[in-house]
Amino acid sequence: MVTIALPKGRLTEEATELFQRSSLISIDISQETRKLVLEDPRGNLRFLMVKPFDVPTYVEYGIADMGIVGKDVLLEVNKKVYELLDLKIGKCFIALAGPKGLREELLKKPEKIIATKFPNITKEYFENVLGEDVQIIKLNGSVELAPILGLSDMIVDIVESGRTLRENGLEVYEKLYDISARLIINRASLKLKREIEGIVNCLERMILQ
């Protein structure tokens, strides 16, 4: 049996659809909202429903053989996993954003405060790309509130449609990285479990269609 870690949340439905279209599963994982461990009736695949940032950890330690996770998570955490495929789902981007109309003023500000769920990505971008040292405040949600309430000057966050930013008087200043879901694999599992190659081939064919 191959164990696959899936992220709970926005990627679950798209990942389920991808597995179904690849004829790998017969169950609808996205409808099993309360179960944390799911097995396909055919008995060859087991799914672990975990938080997105925990997916690489389960794969790294071999609890899961494979996982689906956003590139944002892989950029933020340094885990020893093999990134095998860009699954072309869950597309969005990481952006530097702030109050509408203040872009030039805030980018020129000498001592910037940035709120984000991605402190490592933010630090790497400002230090290595812009050559700046900034104060970073780590938040776990509702990052858009930070500049509105004066906690930060700007934010670094995931943007899909940009609607949440617009509704809160914010706008994108810079696009940092394009993001999509990736298939990651435990290195030992890749060598030991022959079934993995078949799963990967099925997913790869579906992506290329």
UniProtKB/Swiss-Prot annotation:
Family according to the record: Belongs to the ATP phosphoribosyltransferase family. Short subfamily.
InterPro entries hit by this protein: ATP_PRibTrfase_cat (IPR013820), ATP_PRibTrfase_CS (IPR018198), ATP_PRibTrfase_HisG (IPR001348), ATP_PRibTrfase_HisG_short (IPR024893)
NCBIfam families, A to Z: hisG (TIGR00070)
GN (gene name): hisG
GO cellular component: cytoplasm
CDD domains associated with the record: PBP2_HisGs
Main location (coarse class): cytoplasm
Subunit structure: Heteromultimer composed of HisG and HisZ subunits.
Function: Catalyzes the condensation of ATP and 5-phosphoribose 1-diphosphate to form N'-(5'-phosphoribosyl)-ATP (PR-ATP). Has a crucial role in the pathway because the rate of histidine biosynthesis seems to be controlled primarily by regulation of HisG enzymatic activity.
GO biological process: L-histidine biosynthetic process
Domain notes: Lacks the C-terminal regulatory region which is replaced by HisZ.
Catalytic activity entry: 1-(5-phospho-beta-D-ribosyl)-ATP + diphosphate = 5-phospho-alpha-D-ribose 1-diphosphate + ATP
Entry's EC annotation: 2.4.2.17
GO terms assigned for molecular function: ATP binding; ATP phosphoribosyltransferase activity
Pfam families recorded: HisG
Pathway assignment: Amino-acid biosynthesis; L-histidine biosynthesis; L-histidine from 5-phospho-alpha-D-ribose 1-diphosphate: step 1/9
Alphabetic keyword roster: Amino-acid biosynthesis, ATP-binding, Cytoplasm, Glycosyltransferase, Histidine biosynthesis, Nucleotide-binding, Transferase
Cellular localisation: Cytoplasm
Protein name (database record): ATP phosphoribosyltransferase
Recorded superkingdom: Bacteria
